[in-house]
Amino acid sequence: MKAIIVLLMVVTSNADRICTGITSSNSPHVVKTATQGEVNVTGVIPLTTTPTKSHFANLKGTKTRGKLCPKCLNCTDLDVALGRPKCMGTIPSAKASILHEVKPVTSGCFPIMHDRTKIRQLPNLLRGYEHIRLSTHNVINAETAPGGPYKVGTSGSCPNVTNGNGFFATMAWAVPKNDNNKTATNPLTVEVPYICTEGEDQITVWGFHSDNEAQMVKLYGDSKPQKFTSSANGVTTHYVSQIGGFPNQAEDGGLPQSGRIVVDYMVQKSGKTGTITYQRGILLPQKVWCASGRSKVIKGSLPLIGERDCLHEKYGGLNKSKPYYTGEHAKAIGNCPIWVKTPLKLANGTKYRPPAKLLKERGFFGAIAGFLEGGWEGMIAGWHGYTSHGAHGVAVAADLKSTQEAINKITKNLNSLSELEVKNLQRLSGAMDELHNEILELDEKVDDLRADTISSQIELAVLLSNEGIINSEDEHLLALERKLKKMLGPSAVDIGNGCFETKHKCNQTCLDRIAAGTFNAGEFSLPTFDSLNITAASLNDDGLDNHTILLYYSTAASSLAVTLMIAIFIVYMVSRDNVSCSICL
């Protein structure tokens, strides 16, 4: 008879593990967020730069005005604005102008009292217009003005092109023509008509002359202080002349003068008439400036060398490389970065994670259980992706679609910040346009406060953008997990935390196909589990029946068991000194 001995052999298979993950980096950067404070990320986009000082330049794509009249040699801008005889020329059109004469300058003609009027602003006012031209004819007939007849006074200090006596083209020095009208007079009024083309601003220059008592009597027949008033567009200005007390002064090599002139201007809007009320010594308006358009004005220096994106009062000409800058805040024109108080960086990657580690612990029958933490090294083609662990080692593959979605979100945030930049620039530009007539009197504290407010708005926008970029990682990983689960199907078991245990091997090729979305579980063979192997052992039949065989086996086994028990008992008793054993030969 044959006896059957059953031998069991089970073949097991080590499954691979696939997980979704995020790239790691060996050089983390730090960005600021709204609620998480400083966060380490794998990459950043610097949004700020700190400029260095450079020379001033022309603005790219824009006509930039340095001197009002570049062809008027040896002339200050004030000479040009007043119409000094040897400083008559064309002022080129420009959308940007450099205020290069910071300190009040002399006229280079007759001594002017700068401290009593805003005359030093006249060149700056003209710079604020894109198009400027001097009228071809006079706005008033000075000889027949009220209080006349007058003769137009000239001075050897104001030589004309033939080196004869002259005077400013914008004003007529109204001196009584004969002794009969060299007398004191009550205030007289003259209307100043609008003679420019419709839509242009008319800048009308006027003034008055005063001297010591002797000269006042000689010229005007009255040594008392004279009263003057101008009015245009609801703005009225009053003056009372000063008699005497002036030292002799020569301008630009001219003759010494004991008298002074006070010069002012008024801006007449399209179609509006102005008025001037005066007594003796009036400088009546003659040629007027007709101006239109806006030219942005900034303090700077000449010459203008080359071209730049931006002109900055502190740094000169700049090329814009970043949307914002840190350093000294000052006015700037052109395509300029916006000033912010601190450096800003936009997250351009994922939240930093150290390289992933596989933490292992022993389970039943030595089975290895593990879980992953950190980010994956080697994910060079993207930020999000997959990793597998198994006999092949570690394989990593990036998911390009998920990474592109993350990049698109960052680009959207960057564009939003750019839109915020444009809005703030428009706001600043509007404020500057409203105040361009008073550019030298702008309150720096107000300007700094406005800059601080805008800086805070921008910083908050960057913090919120970084917050959104970092928080969106969970969305991308969840989407990857759903995508992975769908592709693996029944060939894997979801073990949580974005990981799946597969019923097949998944090497680099397998993982690359998962990342590319072309994975097919059927292409990777499932491991086979061998069924129970049963081997039958045949025993020779020597005439012994089964009962006899079993009797022999049981007797031998029982005898062996009893013998072992006795031997163990004797050894135990000897060790306890309860039994002694003597051996004699």
Curated annotation (Swiss-Prot):
The keyword Transferase does not apply. One of its GO terms (molecular function) is host cell surface receptor binding. Palmitoylated. Disulfide bonds join C19-C499, C75-C87, C109-C158, C506-C510. The keyword Disulfide bond applies. It is a single-pass type I membrane protein. It comes from the Viruses. Residues 16-553 are extracellular. Residues 1-15 form the signal peptide. One of its GO terms (biological process) is fusion of virus membrane with host plasma membrane. GO terms for cellular component: host cell plasma membrane; membrane; viral envelope; virion membrane. The chain crosses the membrane at residues 554-574. Keywords: Disulfide bond, Fusion of virus membrane with host endosomal membrane, Fusion of virus membrane with host membrane, Glycoprotein, Hemagglutinin, Host cell membrane, Host membrane, Host-virus interaction, Lipoprotein, Membrane, Palmitate, Signal, Transmembrane, Transmembrane helix, Viral attachment to host cell, Viral envelope protein, Viral penetration into host cytoplasm, Virion, Virus endocytosis by host, Virus entry into host cell. Glycans are attached at N40, N74, N160, N181, N319, N348, N507, N533, N546. SUPFAM superfamilies: Influenza hemagglutinin (stalk), Viral protein domain. Belongs to the influenza viruses hemagglutinin family. Major glycoprotein, comprises over 80% of the envelope proteins present in virus particle. The extent of infection into host organism is determined by HA. Influenza viruses bud from the apical surface of polarized epithelial cells (e.g. bronchial epithelial cells) into lumen of lungs and are therefore usually pneumotropic. The reason is that HA is cleaved by tryptase clara which is restricted to lungs. However, HAs of H5 and H7 pantropic avian viruses subtypes can be cleaved by furin and subtilisin-type enzymes, allowing the virus to grow in other organs than lungs. Binds to sialic acid-containing receptors on the cell surface, bringing about the attachment of the virus particle to the cell. Plays a major role in the determination of host range restriction and virulence. Class I viral fusion protein. Responsible for penetration of the virus into the cell cytoplasm by mediating the fusion of the membrane of the endocytosed virus particle with the endosomal membrane. Low pH in endosomes induce an irreversible conformational change in HA2, releasing the fusion hydrophobic peptide. Several trimers are required to form a competent fusion pore. HAMAP family: INFV_HEMA. This is Hemagglutinin. It comes from Influenza B virus (strain B/Beijing/1/1987). The gene is HA.
